[in-house]
Regions:
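Membrane-proximal helix-turn-helix segments that form the acceptor-binding/catalytic region
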Residues: 121, 134, 146-196
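Carbohydrate-associated surface elements
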Residues: 202, 224
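N-terminal strand-loop element at the rim of the active site
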Residues: 33-82, 91, 273
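Short hydrophobic beta-strand element within catalytic cores of glycosyltransferases
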Residues: 330-333
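Conserved donor-binding/catalytic core segment of Leloir-type glycosyltransferases
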Residues: 225, 234-251, 257-262
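A charged, aromatic-enriched C-terminal amphipathic alpha-helix characteristic of glycosyltransferases
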Residues: 371-401
């Protein structure tokens, strides 16, 4: 298929979360390659870089599910966004499915399942990137927030529906199940046009039983990583263990803080979230820098001897792990996380059983028992897959050729 136009669908018109960053950065890169790119989004603000790069923006100007003050209207719209459906049909009508491809990154927060019905109705080939598990699991993570543990239920089975796993309450879990039923119906009806790509081998394996029900083709499409600096970090004189990410229970931030405190290690946390104030009060020994970018971020990264990625749920990948490895910083990662495929134990990092705090503590001790110069030498010879934006675009264009 000779692709001329690409319509990118994403909940937000700016960078919000990992999926949003990929949607935004890839849209800019595709436009720079000469494609006519349309960015279809619902929730603002819209980043001015889009139009500055010649990207056409379709903006619905709607609040997302969490910030909308009218919770009932928001809940209904989150199941079926009528405006998104209507405007998507209008947008698609301006292009031909013979030379135009749809790329979907985020739809759960605002756009809803309605957009998939428009792709089927207008017969557009759709590349759906599986940044999370929402195409199968009602809460998007195969994670029981009540038990703070990985969930083993088959998604949308009777056992799943009857299990209170939601971070809020069981009524909200039932609402999620209704939303999931609508999404499943829309996806299955659009199966002829959907090509679904997971962001890691683990993600692809977990979603395979579900993806076969709604996608005509599937595979793995690795996300590109941000090249913050081309220089490698010299860890030989560094002392800090680093955490990068949201400060939420499921990300394992408490495990990070606890282990560096108990072992009397230096800790740096880059990220924000609802736990920030409590963590600052509870762990005054740890540096909490919030979200930082550019030279400020590089300054903190240069202090790191190791990244701890203590997530308690099955992350589809873990971009921060790939980014730190690319800069020469070893990582400690739990088994069952997508980024674990990048780790060669005792070479560029260590692994432990997900959710096992004692296992994490053993791994951190083991890391410290090895001379830092030895870790540095091992990191200097590591071979990582090429996760540059150029490689990502090449893989996307290869997919275009198979449509």
């Amino acid at each position: 298929m000779q692709v001329k136009n690409i319509i990118v669908y994403n909940d937000y018109g700016h960078i919000y979360g990992g999926a949003g960053k990929i949607a935004f950065d890839s849209a800019l890169a595709l436009a720079q390659k000469g494609y006519h790119v349309v960015f279809f989004c619902a929730t603002g603000p819209v980043d001015s870089q889009l139009e500055a790069h010649g990207i056409e923006v379709v903006f619905l100007n709607q609040a997302d599910a969490l910030s909308d003050k009218n919770k009932m209207a928001s809940a209904c719209r989150n199941i079926w966004n009528r405006k998104a459906y209507r405007e998507s049909l209008k947008c698609l009508a301006q292009y031909s499915p013979q030379d135009t491809v749809v790329m979907v990154h985020g739809y759960v927060k605002t756009l809803s399942a309605a957009i998939f019905s428009t792709f089927r109705k207008r017969q557009f080939k759709t590349i759906l990137t599986l940044h999370d598990y929402f195409t199968a699991c009602p809460n998007g993570g195969f994670f029981n927030y009540q038990k703070n543990a990985y969930c083993t239920c088959k998604a949308m089975s009777t056992r799943c529906v009857l299990t209170h796993c939601d971070s809020r309450n069981y009524a909200y879990k039932l609402y999620r199940c209704v939303r999931q039923s609508v999404l499943n119906h829309c996806l299955r009806r659009a199966k002829k046009y959907i090509h679904a790509y997971a962001v890691s081998k683990l993600c692809e394996e977990k979603l395979r039983p579900y993806v076969t029900q709604f996608a005509t083709k599937s595979g793995v499409l690795y996300n590109p990583i941000e090249i913050i600096t081309n220089e490698k970090i010299d860890i030989t004189h560094n002392n800090a263990f680093l955490y990068v990410g949201r400060l939420t229970e499921d990300k394992g931030i408490h495990d990070f803080c606890k282990v560096v405190t108990e072992l009397q290690l230096q800790g740096i946390v880059l990220g924000d979230g609802y736990l920030l104030d409590d963590l600052k009060h509870q762990y005054p020994n740890i540096t909490f820098a919030g979200w930082v970018n550019g030279s400020d971020k590089i300054a903190y990264l240069r202090q790191a001897k190791c990244l701890i990625f203590p997530t308690r749920h099955s992350e589809t990948f873990g971009l921060s792990v790939a980014e730190m490895l690319s800069m020469g910083v070893p990582c400690i990662v739990p088994l069952g996380c997508g980024a674990v495929e990048l780790i060669r134990p005792n070479d560029n990092g260590l692994t432990y059983k997900m959710g096992d705090y004692d296992g994490l503590k053993v791994a951190v001790k083991q890391f410290n028992q090895t001379e830092i110069a030895t870790w540095a030498a091992r990191m200097s010879t590591q071979q990582l897959p090429n996760l540059s934006m150029a490689t990502y675009l090449s893989n996307v264009e290869r997919i275009f050729s198979t449509l």
